[in-house]
């Protein structure tokens, strides 16, 4: 199934914040990618530049957790926290980034 990049939606929140994603009525969320951790240095730097300890880390269950909460629903909210995803890189400021589309149910 080919999906135009223009259809892909991307949302991101810093650690300890809630991410809410939603689709128009009659459409459901399809998760393409989700990462809880860190891929980029300049995003959500944290206090005193805490991101510098580990710039590339990712919780292995990131996508599964978000899919379980969101897949097929018209909207969902996920808390970006170690209590939800585990801590893939202690001492590093993390964020949750989700890429998804809205698809007709």
UniProtKB/Swiss-Prot annotation:
Residue stretches making up the SUEL-type lectin domain: 13-103
Organism superkingdom: Eukaryota
Keyword Disulfide bond: yes
Gene Ontology terms: cellular component: cytoplasm
Record keywords, A-Z: Cytoplasm, Disulfide bond, Lectin
Protein's UniProt keywords contain Cytoplasm: yes
One family name in Pfam for this protein: SUEL_Lectin
Cell location: Cytoplasm
Principal subcellular localization: cytoplasm
Subunit structure: Homodimer; disulfide-linked.
Function: This protein binds D-galactoside. May have an important role in the activation of eggs (triggered by fertilization), or in their subsequent differentiation. The dimeric form is essential for hemagglutination activity.
Protein name (database record): D-galactoside-specific lectin
Species this protein is from: Heliocidaris crassispina
Lineage of the species this protein comes from: Eukaryota, Metazoa, Echinodermata, Eleutherozoa, Echinozoa
